[in-house]
Amino acid sequence: FKRAVKGGYAIPAFNFNNLEQLQAIITAASETKSPVILQVSKGARAYANPILLRYMAEGAVEYAKSLGCNHPEIVLHLDHGDSFELVKGCVDLGFSSVMIDGSSLPYEENIELTKKCVEYAHQFDVTVEAELGVLAEEVIDFSTRTGCDSLAISIGTSHGAYKFKPEQCTRDPKTGRLVPPPLAFDILHEIEEKLPGFPIVLHGSSSVPQEFVNIINKYGGNMPG
Protein backbone atom coordinates (compact mmCIF):
# COMPACT_ATOMS: atom_id res chain seq x y z
CA PHE A 1 0.00 0.00 0.00
CA LYS A 2 2.78 2.43 0.90
CA ARG A 3 4.51 1.89 -2.44
CA ALA A 4 1.23 2.29 -4.29
CA VAL A 5 0.40 5.55 -2.51
CA LYS A 6 3.90 6.89 -3.10
CA GLY A 7 3.90 5.76 -6.72
CA GLY A 8 0.41 7.08 -7.44
CA TYR A 9 -1.12 3.82 -8.66
CA ALA A 10 -3.91 1.51 -7.59
CA ILE A 11 -3.63 -2.18 -6.78
CA PRO A 12 -6.27 -4.33 -8.50
CA ALA A 13 -8.21 -6.90 -6.50
CA PHE A 14 -10.01 -9.79 -8.20
CA ASN A 15 -12.31 -12.40 -6.73
CA PHE A 16 -11.74 -16.01 -7.70
CA ASN A 17 -13.67 -19.21 -7.09
CA ASN A 18 -11.77 -21.76 -9.16
CA LEU A 19 -8.52 -22.59 -10.92
CA GLU A 20 -9.47 -21.12 -14.30
CA GLN A 21 -10.22 -17.70 -12.83
CA LEU A 22 -7.00 -17.79 -10.84
CA GLN A 23 -4.93 -18.63 -13.92
CA ALA A 24 -6.42 -15.68 -15.81
CA ILE A 25 -5.74 -13.26 -12.95
CA ILE A 26 -2.11 -14.33 -12.49
CA THR A 27 -1.42 -14.38 -16.22
CA ALA A 28 -2.73 -10.81 -16.60
CA ALA A 29 -0.85 -9.58 -13.53
CA SER A 30 2.39 -11.13 -14.78
CA GLU A 31 2.00 -9.69 -18.28
CA THR A 32 1.36 -6.20 -16.91
CA LYS A 33 3.92 -6.53 -14.08
CA SER A 34 1.25 -5.54 -11.59
CA PRO A 35 0.85 -6.44 -7.93
CA VAL A 36 -2.46 -8.16 -7.38
CA ILE A 37 -4.85 -8.95 -4.55
CA LEU A 38 -6.57 -12.35 -4.79
CA GLN A 39 -9.94 -12.01 -3.10
CA VAL A 40 -12.06 -14.77 -1.62
CA SER A 41 -15.65 -14.09 -0.63
CA LYS A 42 -17.65 -15.85 2.05
CA GLY A 43 -19.49 -17.64 -0.75
CA ALA A 44 -16.24 -18.76 -2.38
CA ARG A 45 -15.10 -20.23 0.93
CA ALA A 46 -18.28 -22.27 1.10
CA TYR A 47 -18.05 -23.32 -2.55
CA ALA A 48 -14.35 -24.09 -3.01
CA ASN A 49 -13.18 -24.83 0.57
CA PRO A 50 -10.93 -22.32 2.35
CA ILE A 51 -8.00 -24.73 2.65
CA LEU A 52 -7.96 -25.39 -1.09
CA LEU A 53 -8.23 -21.68 -1.83
CA ARG A 54 -5.29 -20.92 0.45
CA TYR A 55 -3.03 -23.44 -1.29
CA MET A 56 -4.27 -22.39 -4.72
CA ALA A 57 -3.03 -18.91 -3.86
CA GLU A 58 0.36 -20.32 -2.83
CA GLY A 59 0.49 -22.15 -6.16
CA ALA A 60 -0.34 -18.88 -7.90
CA VAL A 61 2.91 -17.39 -6.59
CA GLU A 62 4.92 -20.24 -8.13
CA TYR A 63 2.92 -19.95 -11.34
CA ALA A 64 3.76 -16.25 -11.56
CA LYS A 65 7.44 -17.10 -11.15
CA SER A 66 7.20 -19.58 -14.01
CA LEU A 67 5.84 -16.74 -16.16
CA GLY A 68 8.97 -14.69 -15.52
CA CYS A 69 7.91 -12.70 -12.48
CA ASN A 70 10.90 -13.03 -10.15
CA HIS A 71 9.31 -11.39 -7.12
CA PRO A 72 5.52 -11.76 -7.38
CA GLU A 73 3.52 -9.32 -5.25
CA ILE A 74 0.46 -11.46 -4.57
CA VAL A 75 -1.71 -11.49 -1.46
CA LEU A 76 -4.73 -13.56 -0.42
CA HIS A 77 -7.56 -11.44 0.96
CA LEU A 78 -10.95 -12.09 2.53
CA ASP A 79 -13.57 -9.99 0.75
CA HIS A 80 -16.51 -8.64 2.77
CA GLY A 81 -16.13 -10.64 5.94
CA ASP A 82 -19.25 -10.12 8.03
CA SER A 83 -18.26 -11.53 11.41
CA PHE A 84 -15.30 -11.80 13.76
CA GLU A 85 -15.47 -15.59 13.50
CA LEU A 86 -15.08 -15.50 9.72
CA VAL A 87 -12.19 -13.04 9.94
CA LYS A 88 -10.47 -15.12 12.63
CA GLY A 89 -10.84 -18.27 10.55
CA CYS A 90 -9.09 -16.66 7.59
CA VAL A 91 -6.32 -15.21 9.75
CA ASP A 92 -5.73 -18.61 11.35
CA LEU A 93 -5.61 -20.22 7.91
CA GLY A 94 -2.82 -17.92 6.74
CA PHE A 95 -4.57 -15.22 4.70
CA SER A 96 -2.42 -12.14 4.02
CA SER A 97 -5.24 -9.71 4.74
CA VAL A 98 -8.91 -9.63 5.63
CA MET A 99 -11.87 -7.33 5.30
CA ILE A 100 -14.47 -6.76 7.96
CA ASP A 101 -17.56 -5.04 6.58
CA GLY A 102 -19.61 -3.55 9.37
CA SER A 103 -21.01 -0.73 7.25
CA SER A 104 -24.59 -1.94 7.74
CA LEU A 105 -24.21 -1.66 11.52
CA PRO A 106 -24.70 1.47 13.62
CA TYR A 107 -21.52 3.54 13.66
CA GLU A 108 -20.35 2.60 17.16
CA GLU A 109 -21.04 -1.10 16.57
CA ASN A 110 -19.04 -0.94 13.33
CA ILE A 111 -16.13 0.55 15.26
CA GLU A 112 -16.37 -2.10 17.98
CA LEU A 113 -16.43 -5.02 15.52
CA THR A 114 -13.69 -3.59 13.32
CA LYS A 115 -11.42 -2.86 16.27
CA LYS A 116 -11.85 -6.42 17.56
CA CYS A 117 -10.86 -7.83 14.16
CA VAL A 118 -7.89 -5.46 13.86
CA GLU A 119 -6.55 -6.35 17.29
CA TYR A 120 -6.68 -10.07 16.49
CA ALA A 121 -5.31 -9.84 12.94
CA HIS A 122 -2.42 -7.54 13.80
CA GLN A 123 -1.04 -10.15 16.19
CA PHE A 124 -0.22 -12.17 13.08
CA ASP A 125 0.86 -9.27 10.83
CA VAL A 126 -2.37 -9.57 8.85
CA THR A 127 -3.72 -6.29 7.49
CA VAL A 128 -7.36 -5.31 7.86
CA GLU A 129 -9.64 -3.48 5.45
CA ALA A 130 -12.71 -1.88 6.99
CA GLU A 131 -15.79 -0.31 5.43
CA LEU A 132 -17.40 2.94 6.49
CA GLY A 133 -19.76 3.97 3.72
CA VAL A 134 -20.21 7.57 2.58
CA LEU A 135 -19.61 9.60 5.74
CA ALA A 136 -16.46 11.52 4.88
CA GLU A 137 -16.59 13.54 8.09
CA GLU A 138 -16.15 10.37 10.18
CA VAL A 139 -13.12 8.83 8.45
CA ILE A 140 -10.50 10.25 10.83
CA ASP A 141 -12.40 9.18 13.94
CA PHE A 142 -13.15 5.75 12.48
CA SER A 143 -9.64 4.96 11.24
CA THR A 144 -8.05 6.23 14.46
CA ARG A 145 -10.31 4.32 16.82
CA THR A 146 -10.23 1.05 14.86
CA GLY A 147 -6.61 1.01 13.70
CA CYS A 148 -7.64 -0.37 10.30
CA ASP A 149 -5.02 -0.48 7.54
CA SER A 150 -7.27 0.51 4.64
CA LEU A 151 -10.79 1.83 4.31
CA ALA A 152 -13.49 1.01 1.78
CA ILE A 153 -15.81 3.90 1.03
CA SER A 154 -18.85 4.30 -1.19
CA ILE A 155 -18.76 6.96 -3.90
CA GLY A 156 -21.34 5.42 -6.22
CA THR A 157 -19.84 2.16 -7.44
CA SER A 158 -21.79 -1.05 -6.97
CA HIS A 159 -20.57 -4.54 -6.14
CA GLY A 160 -20.82 -6.24 -9.53
CA ALA A 161 -21.82 -4.96 -12.93
CA TYR A 162 -25.62 -5.07 -12.66
CA LYS A 163 -26.51 -4.46 -9.02
CA PHE A 164 -27.92 -0.94 -9.26
CA LYS A 165 -31.67 -0.68 -8.85
CA PRO A 166 -33.50 0.86 -11.83
CA GLU A 167 -34.70 3.78 -9.69
CA GLN A 168 -31.06 4.66 -8.98
CA CYS A 169 -30.28 5.04 -12.68
CA THR A 170 -31.15 7.34 -15.56
CA ARG A 171 -31.97 6.13 -19.06
CA ASP A 172 -29.75 7.06 -22.00
CA PRO A 173 -32.09 8.71 -24.56
CA LYS A 174 -30.04 7.38 -27.50
CA THR A 175 -29.54 3.76 -26.48
CA GLY A 176 -32.32 3.28 -23.96
CA ARG A 177 -29.86 1.69 -21.56
CA LEU A 178 -29.90 2.36 -17.84
CA VAL A 179 -26.95 4.49 -16.75
CA PRO A 180 -25.63 4.16 -13.17
CA PRO A 181 -25.54 7.30 -11.01
CA PRO A 182 -22.40 9.47 -11.29
CA LEU A 183 -19.45 8.81 -9.02
CA ALA A 184 -19.06 11.19 -6.07
CA PHE A 185 -15.49 12.32 -6.67
CA ASP A 186 -16.08 15.17 -4.22
CA ILE A 187 -16.37 12.66 -1.37
CA LEU A 188 -13.19 10.94 -2.50
CA HIS A 189 -11.39 14.29 -2.63
CA GLU A 190 -12.66 15.28 0.81
CA ILE A 191 -11.47 12.00 2.33
CA GLU A 192 -8.05 12.37 0.70
CA GLU A 193 -7.76 15.81 2.27
CA LYS A 194 -8.74 14.47 5.70
CA LEU A 195 -6.51 11.37 5.48
CA PRO A 196 -3.72 12.14 2.99
CA GLY A 197 -1.90 9.01 1.91
CA PHE A 198 -4.24 6.61 3.70
CA PRO A 199 -5.12 3.56 1.53
CA ILE A 200 -8.66 3.96 0.19
CA VAL A 201 -10.50 1.01 -1.36
CA LEU A 202 -13.17 1.36 -4.05
CA HIS A 203 -15.30 -1.73 -4.64
CA GLY A 204 -17.40 -2.45 -7.70
CA SER A 205 -15.07 -1.35 -10.50
CA SER A 206 -16.90 -3.54 -13.01
CA SER A 207 -19.82 -1.09 -12.93
CA VAL A 208 -17.82 2.07 -13.68
CA PRO A 209 -18.98 3.69 -16.97
CA GLN A 210 -16.40 4.40 -19.68
CA GLU A 211 -16.63 8.17 -19.16
CA PHE A 212 -15.18 7.78 -15.67
CA VAL A 213 -12.50 5.40 -16.93
CA ASN A 214 -11.53 8.19 -19.32
CA ILE A 215 -11.26 10.61 -16.38
CA ILE A 216 -9.01 8.16 -14.54
CA ASN A 217 -6.77 7.91 -17.59
CA LYS A 218 -6.72 11.70 -17.91
CA TYR A 219 -5.15 11.94 -14.46
CA GLY A 220 -2.48 9.31 -14.98
CA GLY A 221 -4.34 6.03 -15.22
CA ASN A 222 -3.66 3.44 -17.89
CA MET A 223 -6.93 1.57 -18.31
CA PRO A 224 -7.97 0.60 -21.84
CA GLY A 225 -11.65 0.88 -22.62
Please report, for each region that a protein language model flagged, where it lies by residue:
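Generic N-terminal amphipathic, Lys/Arg-enriched alpha-helix
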Residues: F1-P12
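Short acidic/histidine-rich active-site segments
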Residues: G204-S207
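Conserved phosphate-binding/catalytic loops in two-lobed NTP-binding clefts
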Residues: P224
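A generic, residue-level signal for flexible/boundary positions that often mark functional hotspots
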Residues: G8-A10, R177, L202
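Alpha/beta enzyme core
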Residues: F1-R3, N18-A44, I51-H71, H80-P199, ...
